[in-house]
Amino acid sequence: MSDTPFGDADHPRPAPIHPDAVLPPPMSSQSADNDPTEALNEAWTNILTKVSKPNRAWLSNTTPVTMHSSTAMVAVPNEFARDRLESKMRYELEELLSDHFHKAIHLAITIDPDLELALGAPDHEDEEEEVPPAQFVPKVTVGVTEPSARPTTTIDDDEGNRLNPKYTFDSFVIGASNRFAHAAAVAVAEAPGKSYNPLLIYGGSGLGKTHLLHAIGRYVMSYYDNVKVKYVSTEELTNDFINAIGTNRTTEFRRSYRDVDVLLVDDIQFLQSKIQTQEEFFHTFNTLHNAQKQIVMTSDRPPKLLEALEPRLRSRFEWGLLTDIQPPDLETRIAILRRKVAAEKITVEPDVLEFIASRIQTNIRELEGALIRVTAFASLNQQPVDISLAEVVLKDLIPEGRETPVTPERIIAETADYFDISADDLLGTSRAQTLVTARQIAMYLCRELTDLSLPKIGAEFGGKDHTTVMHADRKIRALMGEQRQIFNQVSEITNRIKQY
């Protein structure tokens, strides 16, 4: 890749969104009483009466999506329409939106190819064609952009990328709880360094933040030539830095993190209290941001709540766009389960999926875990997957009454007690089969029953690497559908934990 920034004179990078940009006067009471989507619909209708007739024709092809803090999200049918709004109308629209809401509003533009072009849309055959920056050229030319419509190419998941092929925009289920985060991720993937920089997605564990992070990386690499994407967890970033210091290879470390076009950092909250790593990341952030290279991060909370993070880093994390992901609503949970059974090629009746979705309301990971338990139980007993079976399985998973939060300490203690071993042995390194099985089940239950990320679970198990936790999770999931003993062990330990 060239060192030339993504933005250029013809494609200026939008000004970053900053909390200090919000003006004192409050939003009008009329708009404030509506939900964000209704408020934006009202504003958009008002704006259509104030723009020129040619611009009104262009705006008739747009659809207001939602409001998030000081950002208004609108959808257009294709790249040409987006470029038109970006280059010719952005500042006028932002000014009109700001006037309407009585505060500074940033316009976010995403592409929805399902939108039909209005019959009266202006003819743009004579419009001057804009050429993308030389260093960021698409592999093919397409008229309509949508993540699923992009060309599919082979991505080398080398050490610098390690992007999960299952985590794509196509496989991400969109609902009210994540719609804005998804739209922001797509916007960043389509125009790295131009839309929002940095983009920080925050929310509880198991809600899809990592999925979007990988989807951005895979999308960029599939569509653009010679682009360098680096995905890393904060734990790995810290370990890389410590190893670089110990081996006098800090120059190589800096090159590996700064000579990239898109840097994806997972679980940035774990940077807290790591003073030297924060210092190094501060300079890496500045280098990439000044070169208009894209930075995307995830966190379990917004920057202002990362109290053990240096203020200058918290401030920089707020330069771009902050967007959260909430637990999915019932409709989204059902859609997630439908997608899961289709991917796994298993048959589950709709009423069973609705029943499972109604019982699991916390996060996607636990939702999919419940489905796995139900289908595994049915497979072991050669029974059809029906509601009565689901009730039996989920009764132990979610007992009636008020439930206290599950902690890794409780999971470790109950698992050790079940296998009649000490907690120290369970957390140790012995490869004795009983200890390995107990350790893997405990890791699986931590993954399913808590909000802890993979690196955090690894830390609870004596500093195990996150890949060890991932392997344990996958292995136990598979064995539950194959070995009755494993299924019973997991179910009995879960029941003990839930009845604590």
Curated annotation (Swiss-Prot):
- Residue spans of biased composition, Pro residues class: 14-27
Q: Which InterPro entries match?
A: AAA+_ATPase, Chromosome_initiator_DnaA, Chromosome_initiator_DnaA-like, Chromosome_initiator_DnaA_CS, DnaA_C, DnaA_dom, DnaA_N_sf, P-loop_NTPase
One of the record's GO molecular function terms:
lipid binding
Q: Chief localization class? A: cytoplasm
Q: Where is this region: Domain III, AAA+ region?
A: 162-378
A Pfam family per the record:
Bac_DnaA_C
Q: Where along this sequence does the record place binding of ATP?
A: 206, 208-210
Which PROSITE patterns does its entry note? DNAA
Listed GO biological process terms: DNA replication initiation; regulation of DNA replication
Q: What ranges does the record give for the region Disordered, renumbered to this chain?
A: 1-37
**Tagged with keyword RNA-binding:** no
Any single Gene Ontology cellular-component annotation: cytoplasm
Ranges for the region named Domain II are 103-161
Name the keywords, alphabetized: ATP-binding, Cytoplasm, DNA replication, DNA-binding, Lipid-binding, Nucleotide-binding
Where in or outside the cell?
Answer: Cytoplasm
Q: Where is this region: Domain IV, binds dsDNA?
A: 379-500
The family line of this record is: Belongs to the DnaA family.
Fill in the domain comment: Domain I is involved in oligomerization and binding regulators, domain II is flexibile and of varying length in different bacteria, domain III forms the AAA+ region, while domain IV binds dsDNA.
This protein's assembly is summarised as:
Oligomerizes as a right-handed, spiral filament on DNA at oriC.
- Role this protein plays: Plays an essential role in the initiation and regulation of chromosomal replication. ATP-DnaA binds to the origin of replication (oriC) to initiate formation of the DNA replication initiation complex once per cell cycle. Binds the DnaA box (a 9 base pair repeat at the origin) and separates the double-stranded (ds)DNA. Forms a right-handed helical filament on oriC DNA; dsDNA binds to the exterior of the filament while single-stranded (ss)DNA is stabiized in the filament's interior.
Q: What is the protein's given name?
A: Chromosomal replication initiator protein DnaA
Organism from which the protein derives: Cutibacterium acnes (strain DSM 16379 / KPA171202) (Propionibacterium acnes)
